[in-house]
Regions:
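Long, contiguous internal "core" modules enriched in hydrophobic/ aromatic residues
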Residues: 5, 10-15, 31-32, 75-76, ...
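Membrane-helix interface motif
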Residues: 19, 24-29, 61-63, 154-161
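Membrane helical hairpin/interfacial module
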Residues: 33-91
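General alpha-helical segment detector with a strong preference for membrane-spanning helices
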Residues: 56, 63, 85, 186, ...
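Juxtamembrane/interfacial segments flanking transmembrane helices
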Residues: 60-68, 122-127, 192-198, 283-287
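C-terminal structured interaction module
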Residues: 263-298
Length: 298
């Protein structure tokens, strides 16, 4: 599939925002942190949500028609995401302003629902084997929580310094778990085999069939939208890059930082760069069955 940067930014930004909010609300319930820490964290979470929502509009051919997306909520996970995302944003704002844990609990439920909606947009597609797995949902949640925790550490240094250490330790654990599950997903996807072949696509049982031409010389919507257009060495390089950046690099910085705000911010920046690479690879890795026909170009 073709990685669209608007969707990459949407999913990574709102994932970090969701993770940050869940951590802050859990702390508010369990530890009663300073109010300015909660308000600052909710403000950052809202800013990330707004940025992600703004990025998503660049993926629309007609942004003025975006409101119509809600009409298909009975059958479309995308429509459900369009409903849940602004509802979650509104409840985060209410929680930050009102100090109401009831509002926070509603926001937490909406946050989890948003994880489900976003992940299921991809996991429900049975013909894309790389996505059609519960690991898609698990990865979205774990990577979101890990990035939210990594972002919470420098915010704690600013407003809740006595808890920055435990948060850094939690970020290490969440990052390690997210990394392990993502590696498990890579191993699973590497073992997948196409359910269709060129023989089954054209209904001929001849074992040796080679495509010589596809009827036109240039590209088309299909070859642009359903293939990333990059050679295998590029995919391999991106895979190793995100595996290094989403956990080992930020974990090393957090361990070496000694409570430094600048180092913790750098750890989040590195991890977020890794998340962008991971999400690009997530889309590029998915092999659309239609490329059996367009294989001379895809």
């Amino acid at each position: 599939m073709r990685p669209a940067w608007s969707v990459i930014l949407l999913t990574t930004l709102i994932g970090a925002a969701q993770g940050l909010f869940l951590i802050v609300f859990a702390l508010d319930v369990l530890r009663s942190p300073p109010r300015d820490f909660v308000v600052l964290s909710c403000g950052i979470s809202l800013a990330l949500l707004v940025a992600g929502l703004a990025a998503s509009f660049f993926h629309l051919g007609h942004p003025e028609r975006a409101w119509r997306a809600v009409a298909m909520w009975r059958t479309s996970w995308l429509s459900r995401e369009v409903i849940v995302l602004p509802a979650f944003m509104a409840m985060v704002l209410v929680y930050a302003v009102s100090e109401s844990r009831v509002a926070g609990a509603i926001a937490a439920v909406l946050c989890l629902a948003l994880f489900v909606c976003t992940a299921m947009i991809y996991a429900c597609l049975k013909f894309l084997q790389e996505w059609h797995t519960p690991l898609t949902f698990v990865n979205f949640v774990l990577l979101g929580v890990a990035s939210g925790l990594t972002l919470a550490v420098p915010l704690a240094v600013l407003r809740y310094p006595q808890f920055a250490g435990p948060l850094a330790l939690a970020a290490f654990g969440a990052g390690a778990l997210a990394w392990i599950v993502r590696v498990a997903t890579l191993i699973r996807n590497a073992r997948l085999r196409p359910k269709s072949t060129i023989q089954s696509a054209i209904g001929i049982a001849q074992p040796k069939i080679a495509q010589k031409a596809q009827g036109f010389m240039g590209g088309s919507f299909n070859t642009r939208e359903f293939f990333h257009g990059k050679p295998k060495p590029v995919l391999g390089a991106v895979r190793w890059l995100f595996l290094a950046l989403i956990f080992p690099a930020p974990a090393w910085l957090q361990g070496w930082g000694g409570g430094s705000l600048e180092v913790f911010l750098a750890a989040f920046a590195l991890q977020f760069a890794g998340l962008l690479a991971e999400r690009w690879y997530f889309f590029a890795e998915a092999r659309h069955p239609q490329n059996l026909y367009y294989q001379s170009m895809a």
